[in-house]
Amino acid sequence: MCYQTSKKKRRSRKRRAQEEKEKMGKGVVSEKVKLVVALITLQFCFAGFHIVSRVALNIGVSKVVYPVYRNLLALLLIGPFAYFFEKKERPPLTISLLAQFFFLALIGITANQGFYLLGLYYATPTFASAMQNSVPAITFIMACALRLEHIDLVRKHGVAKVLGTLVSIGGATVITLYRGFPIFDQGLNMQKEEVVGSDNSHSLTLGWLYLMGHCLSWAGWMVLQAPVLKQYPAKLTLTSFTCFFGLIQFLVIALFVETDLNNWIIVSWEELFTILYAGIIASGLVVYLQTWCIYKSGPVFVAVFQPLQTLLVAAMAFLILGDQLYSGGIVGAVFIMLGLYLVLWGKNEERKLALEESQQDPESLTKHLLEAQHKKSNSESEV
């Protein structure tokens, strides 16, 4: 009777353990799906921002007024949510934290957005997006230097992450450097204003320099944001402070650069749309999504989705700006998808390994050894 009861208990415990394992597995899959969907959405929003920003420059929106309105809208959008939703989880503010927020805004808002607009003025959206594909490599180097990312080249998952990053960057580079033959006729060309900037080599060099500054500041912002989030995990509040300090910094610049009050007046629906998109989507939704993704997966995993954006920008530029689509874009897209698959596989294997290692609890192992030793001593005493 006692034997049957203990057997039933063992079966019950085994069943409960199996159910908990299944629930945990479903939760992990759900988190992965949410993360991947968020990152893909992020790239769609960024791709749209490339096109919208180019339209804004074409119709004459000031390169200083544009980011001021953008960050003001983002602050007005995110600030109330941060105040009401993060009251309980918001840690107390310190001078050190405020200084870190100011520095993050200087890198991630002021330098990042300023260099981007200057670079886009001299280059095309596709070229600007392709330049941004250096961000994963820069982020990877910075994260490794600060010991925020560990790559084990002895194991398969480490090699897959490195190889996938390189393949993705290579695919995006192919889109830029190899044109190939045209696939479709000219796009819709919905934006008919004359394109600003110039196509000469001097202008392209300036565009390259400004966009490289943009990539360096963006990568630095993603890497430095990770340790700040550990100290201050209230993501909405952190985003609000970053937008606030970025707005202040751009206003100071505007006092010296943009003195003509006419440039601050919105005169067309096109200008209004570009500013609303930049503020609500690019600085509001996108910044929060990116902050959440960095918190969930780390800066390198977020940056590795960047090459997908170049494919989206090329398609949008074809449909909206009338840019021609070439076979090089298709070839590059294949490499991008292959690279993303390699990184996702490597990250998945790394998580599996970490989960297996965490299940080997040293305390339970010690307890098991002590019990075995106790049983051994009891048997010896009985003898």
Swiss-Prot record:
Keywords: Membrane, Repeat, Transmembrane, Transmembrane helix. It is found in: Membrane. GO terms for cellular component: membrane. Residues 44-173, 216-344 form the EamA domain. It is a multi-pass membrane protein. InterPro entries: EamA_dom (IPR000620), WAT1-related (IPR030184). It comes from the Eukaryota. It holds the Pfam family EamA. The keyword Heme does not apply. Residues 1-16 have a biased composition (Basic residues). GO terms for molecular function: transmembrane transporter activity. The chain crosses the membrane at residues 33-53, 65-85, 91-111, 126-146, 158-178, 204-224, 237-257, 272-292, 300-320, 325-345. Residues 1-23 are annotated as: Disordered. Belongs to the drug/metabolite transporter (DMT) superfamily. Plant drug/metabolite exporter (P-DME) (TC 2.A.7.4) family. This is WAT1-related protein At3g18200. It comes from Arabidopsis thaliana (Mouse-ear cress).
